[in-house]
Amino acid sequence: AILDQSCKGIFDRELFKKLDRVCDDCYNLYRKPYVAIDCRRGCYQNLVFRQCIQDLQLMDDLDEYANAVQV
């Protein structure tokens, strides 16, 4: 996993793993290195992360992920 330096502060490891997993799964879906990097950019607060949520059919969990990246 690539830790984006924009993620600062104290983190819940389980929460971080869950967010990171979205980016890993999205990378596995598309097999493009920039997907994994861009997905994590801005501590997961970006359009690529949101698109990954949609592409992985996780829209039912969108509110949970949105709250997580605002912590």
Swiss-Prot record:
Tissue: Produced by the medulla terminalis X-organ in the eyestalks and transported to the sinus gland where they are stored and released.
Main location as per UniProt: secreted
Keyword Disulfide bond in annotation: yes
Cellular compartments annotated: Secreted
Modified residues (Valine amide): 71
Entry keyword set: Amidation, Carbohydrate metabolism, Disulfide bond, Glucose metabolism, Hormone, Neuropeptide, Secreted
One Pfam match: Crust_neurohorm
Disulfide pairings: 7-43, 23-39, 26-52
Gene Ontology terms describing biological process: circadian rhythm; glucose metabolic process; neuropeptide signaling pathway
Keyword Secreted in annotation: yes
Its job: Hormone found in the sinus gland of isopods and decapods which controls the blood sugar level. Has a secretagogue action over the amylase released from the midgut gland. May act as a stress hormone and may be involved in the control of molting and reproduction.
Name the record gives this protein: Crustacean hyperglycemic hormone isoform 1
Species of the source: Macrobrachium rosenbergii
